């Protein structure tokens, strides 16, 4: 079955796996998903991920989820910009999540990065998701 929102599908898989206290979750691979997973890993929301490549050019990521005292590190992960309604933000209008305790992942001309890195680089872009 075709997925209309691949990034939203990955975020939903992560959210559902953490609610079920799974250690790992598989998701189809893409460059955008890899960049978002890189940001989640560098910000400490996931342990890491590995890539599996199949002969037909298809890739799959296995994401290692992170828990602290038995509770998921990611309390909330939510898609902001969707295929039907794109959301863009200038650097001065970049939304803060939980007064700076969470992050917003932004796709900018300089790459996919967390909101604080986008402010530091003085670039705006498409607001992909919020993580808290």
Curated annotation (Swiss-Prot):
InterPro entries: Ribosomal_uS8, Ribosomal_uS8_CS, Ribosomal_uS8_sf
UniProt keyword annotations, A-Z: Ribonucleoprotein, Ribosomal protein, RNA-binding, rRNA-binding
Keyword rRNA-binding set for record: yes
Pfam families the UniProt entry points to: Ribosomal_S8
GO biological process, one term: translation
Annotated Gene Ontology cellular component terms: ribonucleoprotein complex; ribosome
MF terms in GO: rRNA binding; structural constituent of ribosome
Domain of life: Bacteria
Subunit structure comment from the entry: Part of the 30S ribosomal subunit. Contacts proteins S5 and S12.
Annotated family: Belongs to the universal ribosomal protein uS8 family.
Function: One of the primary rRNA binding proteins, it binds directly to 16S rRNA central domain where it helps coordinate assembly of the platform of the 30S subunit.
Name of the protein in its database record: Small ribosomal subunit protein uS8
